[in-house]
């Protein structure tokens, strides 16, 4: 008796050669429905429609096709169980040996920012998950394929003989993972649409890559990624495989460069070009200029030692002039919206340099959550991507600031929230001069930033991610010649810092918003 394969797929990659091999080399009969059946018929592959097999028509505009006892009985019946086989024979139902199903493209559908409610709902598959779960449950008797990537390996095993129980069990596991991911994606989307809250289930993202190791060689690591968003859409043009640390640093780099309009630097010569250098997820240099190579060199001036082995992010296409500057350094990665051909040719001499193309649309469509594991659980929070606009800032000091000072303060404020707390940034004229990161006390971070800036701190501004618990940072800033400070405010000792500014001739802004980063 011929074996039966039930095939119903949304993703038709590899379908025709796979089905031809099943029928011509292995004698399978194929049952299929809808668009899959049409595709097989057009390729002259013998196929029986589900409607012909069940004797029941597709109804409700195709919502009900495979939900029928002749389908699910054939999938769920144990082939070694006499009672099950008796029931099949009595109802004239045949055993189904192979189920090939992948689901309506719900994740792809909702990745469109303009998707309608009705379109999203219509792309929730019902019959597909039911068949997948039925076949996976009865995997001792049925093989279940849910991904075109499985076709070739399955045919190789079929050519070598029967599909082993071990292989069927592995396919069943992958099938349940497939439906679990699908259901989580639906739950997450509906949670946001209906209640504007997080789904209780965190990720529907598949493993994109098993990484060589985690932060250290003794740690295992996997990269989970949405196919149609963010880094899942990034294109690596050159270089070694991305590591865990590369990805962490790239994320920090892009989060920082977005402050200055990712891809905005391509909008014309009048637009600011921005460059960010990251080391261990901290900015070690940030600058803006009307010239990209100048922006990079200004960023590099902030801390050229820490830039060694760092990651560079740019807010516009990398040109040849800037590529020449980059090629003189040892860097792990460069990320930009795109690359000029001459720039790629220059960087091609740096064989290990990872060159990443990340489009503006990839960033725009990406939904980000900040996720950290704790003992027995996971913490999930919104990403800190909201800034208080300058017109909402308050100036509690007697001395006000110039337009130029406000521009420098806004620049420093955009940088400091991407520096690990406690964080201090000293800046002037669109360039970071000193960055104090990750200190256990604020005055310690200020000392690092001010000492790094040195004489350049004279006439510069200082930004702090948190309030000043004491007035010591104001006094230290004054000694280095800082003329204006921006900080959240909110300390019970705010007045002490205000009085110190008034006494020492500094202006200060309270933004009213803290930006801790742990």
Curated annotation (Swiss-Prot):
Keyword Metal-binding annotated: no
Reactions performed catalytically: (6R)-10-formyltetrahydrofolate + 5-amino-1-(5-phospho-beta-D-ribosyl)imidazole-4-carboxamide = 5-formamido-1-(5-phospho-D-ribosyl)imidazole-4-carboxamide + (6S)-5,6,7,8-tetrahydrofolate; IMP + H2O = 5-formamido-1-(5-phospho-D-ribosyl)imidazole-4-carboxamide
One Pfam family from the record: AICARFT_IMPCHas
Cellular compartments per GO CC: cytosol
Gene Ontology terms: biological process: 'de novo' IMP biosynthetic process
UniProt keyword Phosphoprotein, yes or no: no
EC code: 2.1.2.3, 3.5.4.10
Family recorded in the similarity comment: Belongs to the PurH family.
Note on domains (UniProt): The IMP cyclohydrolase activity resides in the N-terminal region.
NCBIfam families, alphabetized: PRK00881.1, purH
HAMAP family reported in the protein's UniProt record: PurH
PANTHER family cross-referenced by the UniProt entry: BIFUNCTIONAL PURINE BIOSYNTHESIS PROTEIN ATIC, BIFUNCTIONAL PURINE BIOSYNTHESIS PROTEIN PURH
Protein name per the record: Bifunctional purine biosynthesis protein PurH
């Amino acid at each position: 008796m011929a074996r039966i394969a039930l095939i119903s797929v949304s993703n038709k990659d590899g379908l025709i050669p796979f089905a031809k091999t099943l029928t011509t080399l292995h004698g399978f009969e194929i049952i299929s429905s809808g668009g899959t059946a049409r595709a097989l018929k057009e390729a002259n592959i013998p196929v029986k429609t589900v409607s012909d097999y069940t004797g029941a028509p597709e109804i409700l505009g195709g919502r009900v096709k495979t939900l029928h006892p002749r389908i699910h009985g054939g999938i769920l019946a144990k082939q070694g169980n006499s009672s099950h086989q008796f029931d099949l024979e009595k109802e004239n139902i045949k055993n189904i040996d192979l189920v090939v199903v992948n689901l309506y493209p719900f994740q792809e559908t909702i990745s469109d920012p303009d998707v309608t409610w009705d379109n999203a709902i219509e792309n929730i598959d019902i019959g597909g998950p039911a068949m997948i779960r039925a076949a996976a449950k009865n995997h001792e008797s049925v093989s279940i394929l849910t991904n075109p990537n499985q076709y070739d390996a399955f045919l190789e095993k079929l050519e070598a003989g029967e599909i082993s129980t071990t292989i069927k069990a592995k396919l069943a596991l992958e099938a349940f993972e497939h439906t679990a991911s699908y259901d989580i994606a639906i739950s997450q989307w509906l949670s946001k649409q209906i209640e504007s809250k997080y789904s209780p289930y965190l990720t529907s993202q598949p493993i994109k890559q098993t990484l060589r190791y985690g932060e250290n060689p003794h740690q295992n690591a996997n990269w989970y990624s949405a196919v149609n968003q963010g880094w899942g859409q990034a294109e690596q043009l050159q270089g070694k495989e991305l590591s865990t640390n590369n990805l962490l640093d790239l994320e920090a780099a892009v989060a920082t460069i977005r402050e200055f309009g990712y891809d905005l630097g391509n909008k014309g010569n009048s637009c600011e070009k921005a460059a960010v250098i990251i080391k261990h997820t901290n900015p070690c240099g940030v600058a803006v200029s009307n010239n990209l190579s100048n922006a990079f060199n200004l960023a590099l001036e902030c801390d050229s030692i820490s830039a060694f082995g760092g990651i560079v992010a740019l807010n516009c296409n990398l040109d040849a002039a800037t590529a020449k500057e980059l090629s003189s350094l040892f860097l792990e990665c460069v990320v930009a919206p795109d690359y000029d051909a001459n720039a790629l040719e220059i960087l091609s001499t740096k064989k290990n340099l990872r060159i990443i193309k990340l489009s503006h649309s990839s960033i725009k469509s990406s939904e980000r959550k900040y996720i950290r594991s704790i003992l027995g659980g996971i913490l999930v929070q919104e990403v800190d991507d909201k800034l208080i606009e300058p017109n909402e800032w308050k100036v509690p000091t007697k001395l006000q600031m110039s337009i130029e000072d406000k521009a420098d303060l806004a620049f420093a404020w955009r940088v400091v929230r991407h520096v690990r707390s406690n964080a201090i940034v000293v800046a002037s004229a669109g360039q970071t001069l000193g960055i104090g990161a990750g200190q256990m006390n604020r005055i310690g971070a200020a000392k690092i930033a001010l000492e790094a800036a040195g004489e350049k701190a004279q006439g510069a501004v200082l930004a702090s991610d948190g309030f000043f618990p004491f007035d010591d940072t104001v006094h230290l800033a004054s000694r280095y010649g800082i003329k204006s400070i921006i900080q959240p405010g909110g300390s019970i000792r705010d007045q002490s810092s205000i009085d110190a500014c008034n006494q020492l001739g500094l202006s200060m802004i309270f933004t009213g918003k803290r930006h801790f980063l742990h």
